[in-house]
Design a protein with these regions (language model features):
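S-adenosylmethionine/decaboxylated-SAM
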Residues: 27-36, 46, 50-243
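Membrane-proximal basic amphipathic "stem/tether" segments
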Residues: 1-37, 242
């Protein structure tokens, strides 16, 4: 019991430290958006989004790996519009959730995993159609590995709205919020690095110090990477490519 309590106290202390150090720029629009748009977003990411978009090196596309119901997608678009940027936004998510392989139903409910996936996808489409209509993102229903293969091959593909787009070329920013295991996060970084232009930025979700996810291990490696510089931890890591 004592070990369990000690562990809980340590986790609480880590949470308090992250909260105290976090720069939060939530405004009225973000508050209303978060009421209606489901999502799991650390408020510290808002400042990182805003900072990255204000310092985009060009008008080349920005990418989002992992979109869920579109909360971060809509927030990124909000900051793009607010800063007068017109970068094309391209996102990918196949909506394959942890635990879906364990059974047909969500826990002890009568809701099927397939129904849940369809609901989340429909919610994403509805959310970005309303809140990002002035710069509607191109979304690919593929995994990040599949997406970067399409990008590498410079494929012309149709997004979930049926619009054609030619993939490929350099990008100016990537928000990595896909599978948080070390291997997946590492691969997402390596794929992003191939196309990120000099001065481009990468933000890793749930990468804060003490995070239980494997992507936190990757951060320890990236801070030693001479090709990148740490812009800020708030508490998640935002990097800029130096060369």
């Amino acid at each position: 019991m004592e070990d369990r309590n000690t562990s809980r106290i340590k986790m609480l202390c880590q949470f308090i430290k992250r909260t105290i150090r976090t720069i939060d720029i939530t405004d009225e629009y973000i508050e209303w958006l978060c009421f209606a748009n489901a999502g799991m977003l650390h408020k510290g990411n808002l400042y990182c989004f805003d900072l990255a978009i204000k310092h985009l090196p060009s008008n080349k596309p920005i990418l989002e790996v992992g979109s869920f119901c579109g909360l971060s997608t809509n927030i990124l678009n909000y900051y793009l519009k607010r800063t007068g940027r017109n970068n094309k936004m391209i996102t990918c998510d196949k909506w394959i959730f942890e635990g879906s392989e364990k059974g047909r139903y969500l826990g002890n409910s009568d809701v099927l995993h397939s129904e849940y996936k369809a609901f989340v996808k429909e919610t994403f489409v509805r959310n970005i159609s309303v809140f990002s209509r002035s710069n509607l993102p191109y979304h690919m229903e593929v995994t990040s590995d599949e997406f970067f293969k399409l990008w590498s091959d410079k494929k012309v593909v149709a997004d979930i709205f049926g619009r054609e787009i030619e993939l490929g070329g350099e990008i100016s920013f990537c928000y990595i919020d896909g599978n948080h295991t070390y291997d997946f996060a590492r691969r997402d970084f390596e794929n992003t690095d191939r196309y990120l232009e000099k001065g481009g930025l990468i933000l890793f979700d749930d990468s804060y110090d003490g995070s239980p996810f494997g992507c936190a291990r990757l951060m320890k490696e990236l801070v030693r990477n001479r090709d990148y510089e740490l812009v800020i931890k708030n508490p998640n890591y935002l990097f800029r490519k130096k060369k």
